[in-house]
Amino acid sequence: VKNPEEKTTFNQQLEKWQDQVSSMDKRPGSFTTISGVPLKPLYTPLDLEKLDFEADLGLPGSYPYTRGVQDNMYRGRYWTMRQFSGFGDAFDSNRRYRYLLEQGQTGLSVAFDLPTIMGYDSDHERSLGEVGRCGVAIDSLEDMEVLFSRIPLDQVTTSMTINGPAAIIWCMYLANAQNQGVGLHQVGGTIQNDILKEYIAQKSWIFPPDPSMRLITDILAFAADHVPKWNTISISGYHIREAGSTAVQELAFTLADGFAYVEAGIAAGLNVDTFAPRLSFFFNAHLDFFEEICKYRAARRIWARHLKERYGAKDPRSLKLRFHTQTAGCSLTAQEPENNIVRTTLEALSAVLGGTQSLHTNSMDEVLALPTEKAVTIALRTQQIIAHESGVANTIDPLAGSYFVEALTNQMEEEAEAYFERIEKLGGVLKAIDCGFFQQEIADAAYLFQQAVDKQERIVVGVNRFNSDDKPQIELLKIDPAVEKKQVERLKKLREKRDNNAVSNALNDLRIAAKTNENLVPKILTAVKCYATGGEIVALLKEVFGEYREKPLF
């Protein structure tokens, strides 16, 4: 619509069309996104009158990075296909990793069992019945050596989903790389290391916020000096969404956490451009196709603007929001699990069209158990078909310029900014966590969504509509109970054969350092090289830092 006369004519045409449509029958159901954002029946140039191409879109690889963080995106290379995997002991998971790499996977992603996540060794009383169940059991450097046996760590990047004990697990990985003859400057990968979203959503915390943030800034500083290819935090919206948030809440709360980490790094005396380039993100890909695409585009623009204008970042790499995506586990159904293949495909496609840097596609059986080899192969093949057969990777940001996509991207950005203002008024992210703001927002959103499903206002195929009485006939992966016994026995033998004087000295040095402002990463690295266990290190740090206790919120 180029001039006032044309605009008047177009408005007249639009009004006539609206009158015609308003008298037509409508199919039942609400016309909103999954998150409840109302959708117009038609989007036109009038919805983008305030859009400034250069300021709001630009070109791929250029500020504000709405259209992607690389100049040539998938014309250069495909996203990293990184299937999240881990179960049993290190031997079991090593076999799965090597199988996935043989099948064409291009990166690794480690799932740890609950005892490892919570900082307990496999022989701890609280680990009983949980060893190797929901991920791989890692007690010491010895397990890490087995986990990556015959996998050269200078040739593959690894993402590790670990938070409370992230510094310890990371040091085990670095020590293992050095044992392979790989220099720290060559090691690439990611640790999740996002403790704020633990307080908000996943609840797998160990230490209180202040010492937890201290460990994170220690990692930022050590990596900047010694491990330059490592992504030090994967700021995670995935778990926030899985807990029941809307897409807008996932966007806003994740970026708010990111800003809090930037502020913590700066407060620790670090220049923003020394650590911000190695911050990465982890988003959910849910089923509302266009809402998810717009979420990713808005995230890149918001991050770039805030890092530049609010935090004074000058290195273009600091402004680029790079992210991993996982399809939505909460969208999968136990009923008719084969339907989950279709759900995962749609979600994966939205992540690709939204410009993800790496992707995990859930397996159809993950709602029932850890995935079988067959199921995980289908999930990987889903990515490969999208990459090599669909053609969607041949054009960079192909949905740019769509009136609907650009309008929804703008709307999500505006709603996220409104959340930032509310969080700021509460005193920042930590204060908002303490008063239960995030937790209440997520709980309310989850309740409203479930109500809509229960009332059939939201259709879930095979669950509340088009459902069958047939029970699924599907093979499930079962963890051998003997895994726990074997892991405990290996741990006992490790404690007998290691140099326990060296372990004691290393742990004592760590205890002394933890009571000062000294960077703890070198001390932890020394301890794990002596084969101190994760549980031993966590127990020591609990003595110094204490443990977190959440206030009653509901």
Each PLM stretch: what is its role?
Residues 129-133, 198-207, 240-245, 283-288, ...:
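Short beta-alpha connecting loops at secondary-structure transitions
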Residues 271-275, 313-327, 335-364, 371-396, ...:
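Flexible glycine/proline-rich, aromatic-decorated loop/lid segments
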Residues 139, 157, 162-165, 177, ...:
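Phosphate/diphosphate-binding loops
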Residues 94, 170-171, 248, 293-297, ...:
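Conserved strand-to-helix beginnings and helix N-cap segments that scaffold or border functional pockets
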Residues 1-286, 291-292, 310, 317-324, ...:
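Catalytic alpha/beta active-site cores
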Residues 87, 96-103, 141-151, 172-176, ...:
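Generic, well-ordered alpha-helical scaffold segments in large soluble proteins
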Residues 77, 123-126, 153, 196-199, ...:
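Short acidic (Asp/Glu) and glycine-rich catalytic loops that position anionic groups and cofactors
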Residues 2, 18-50, 58-66, 114, ...:
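Flexible, glycine-rich loop/tail regions that form catalytic "lids" or insertion modules at the edges
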